[in-house]
């Protein structure tokens, strides 16, 4: 298992193919749905709650796929993609801790959008504070997160929940 404290884009893509933490670990999406270019730091003892934190980034370029279709003449990154990135990172954290199975977003307490990501922005930063992880019959991570664009906080989410399941056929 790779217990590194940072990951580059190639390693994140390897996670999407089951080649970073192992073939049975939770996977990140690949291609357009991977909303992360790098993980700057990941640990299991930092953050607001002392149970772990993740800081990750996405480089913003005007040619990103969503700017062409959301919306014509008014391009903006869909808020749901930033929220999905937060769930992606909670699932990644569980895989980094050694969980095996398929990751699924289970919910979120509250989401607030107070700004937007436009094509002229340079960088999105995701900051997650792990609140709790459960590694029993139920495997689940819970985190609070914020999204910053060029250093300004514009999204927040509380109680992001991701579960890891050995069988999702009846989910």
Curated annotation (Swiss-Prot):
Pathway where this protein functions = Lipid metabolism; fatty acid biosynthesis
GO molecular function annotations of the record: (3R)-hydroxyacyl-[acyl-carrier-protein] dehydratase activity; trans-2-decenoyl-acyl-carrier-protein isomerase activity
Q: Which GO terms describe its biological process?
A: unsaturated fatty acid biosynthetic process
Q: How does it assemble?
A: Homodimer.
Keyword entries, A-Z: Cytoplasm, Fatty acid biosynthesis, Fatty acid metabolism, Isomerase, Lipid biosynthesis, Lipid metabolism, Lyase
UniProt xrefs under PANTHER family: 3-HYDROXYACYL-[ACYL-CARRIER-PROTEIN] DEHYDRATASE, 3-HYDROXYDECANOYL-[ACYL-CARRIER-PROTEIN] DEHYDRATASE
InterPro entries for the chain: FabA, FabA_FabZ, HotDog_dom_sf
Any one Pfam family here would be FabA
Subcellular location per UniProt equals: Cytoplasm
Per the UniProt entry, what species is this protein from, by scientific name?
Shewanella oneidensis (strain ATCC 700550 / JCM 31522 / CIP 106686 / LMG 19005 / NCIMB 14063 / MR-1)
Query: Main role?
Result: Necessary for the introduction of cis unsaturation into fatty acids. Catalyzes the dehydration of (3R)-3-hydroxydecanoyl-ACP to E-(2)-decenoyl-ACP and then its isomerization to Z-(3)-decenoyl-ACP. Can catalyze the dehydratase reaction for beta-hydroxyacyl-ACPs with saturated chain lengths up to 16:0, being most active on intermediate chain length.
User: What's the EC number here?
Assistant: 4.2.1.59, 5.3.3.14
Gene designation per UniProt? fabA
Q: Which HAMAP family match?
A: FabA
The name this protein carries in UniProt is 3-hydroxydecanoyl-[acyl-carrier-protein] dehydratase
Q: What protein family is recorded?
A: Belongs to the thioester dehydratase family. FabA subfamily.
Q: Which residues form the active site?
A: 70
Name one cellular component (GO) term: cytoplasm
Catalytic function, reaction form:
a (3R)-hydroxyacyl-[ACP] = a (2E)-enoyl-[ACP] + H2O; (3R)-hydroxydecanoyl-[ACP] = (2E)-decenoyl-[ACP] + H2O; (2E)-decenoyl-[ACP] = (3Z)-decenoyl-[ACP]
